[in-house]
Amino acid sequence: MTFLSIKGLFSRYASSQGPVYAVDDVDFDLDFGESIGIAGESACGKSTLGLSLIRMLSGGSSFGEIMFDDASILDLSESDFDSNFRWKKISMIFQGAMNSLDPVFTIEQQFVEILKQHGFDGNSDELILDSITSVNLDTNVLKKYPHELSGGMKQRVIIAMALILKPKFVIADEPTTALDVLIQAQIINLLKKLKKDGMSFMLITHDLAVLSEIADKIGIMYGGQMVEFGSSQEIYKNPKHPYTQGLLESIPTLKGNIPKYIPGTPPSLLDAPSECRFIDRCPLAIEKCKQLPPKFKTDTGYVRCWLYDDEK
């Protein structure tokens, strides 16, 4: 049963040079218990997509359809969304979040402030303890200040803060960035445990190897568009879009294959899409790529590439 459905989602920022087309015509569905991975280069729209879902797009606007738990999120008033959805049903682990802890308050004080902000009036002590232990932290962490914690501990505190009101869906934006490999593994194992317990995630990352551990479905973002969407198995075993193929070929493997890089630079998001976003970097570009490609259906999703026009 579908619990998150996105149709024709657009998100734009205003700038002195005109609108920034950060998210352009994105579609995907998730069923209960499923998690999605969003991958792509920096500034491709990944974080904006996550912020659009939780309606925290500072300086920007979104339009289209986001159906979550049978409610049209974008049609709700800010007060309704804040009272009934934000942090209660959908929450977010922000990019670089472990640096956002307030240095002058203890961890416990910061948990209490979150609960106050979201109008919680139950047993806060019990809820905070439950949240801390769910991410494998000792309760003595609550009396400490952020500077007394390691990077991995701070990241787990941030995850616990996102989970404190037991949301159904958590958006995790680069949760392993700036952590060493050992701590990255601990965070990934924690997310896998939470997923096994029934929580759904949107994991935003530039690292496709990380997504292979958690994601049931994967969306590949490029130039503000989701150029390919499908099951994790299909994306890894039979990637369709040349950009997806390039990303996978850039991953080092134990087989000794030499990683390849994708030449060129991403397009400016100040330009409204009028042709394939990947045309200037694509080794397989054809004349038809000068037109904006539609979404061609695949076995488990879709691909935005004219090479599959004959297969629709």
Name each model feature, range by range:
Residues 62-75:
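Conserved ABC transporter NBD signature motif
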Residues 73-91, 117, 234-239, 269-273:
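ABC ATPase NBD coupling module
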Residues 123-140, 248:
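Conserved ABC ATPase "signature" region
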Residues 142, 229-312:
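Short catalytic/signature loops enriched in Gly
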Residues 145-149, 153:
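Conserved ABC ATPase signature
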Residues 164-168:
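A short, proline-enriched helix->beta-strand linker immediately N-terminal to the Walker B motif
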Residues 171, 175-257:
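P-loop NTP-binding/switch modules centered on Walker-like glycine-rich loops
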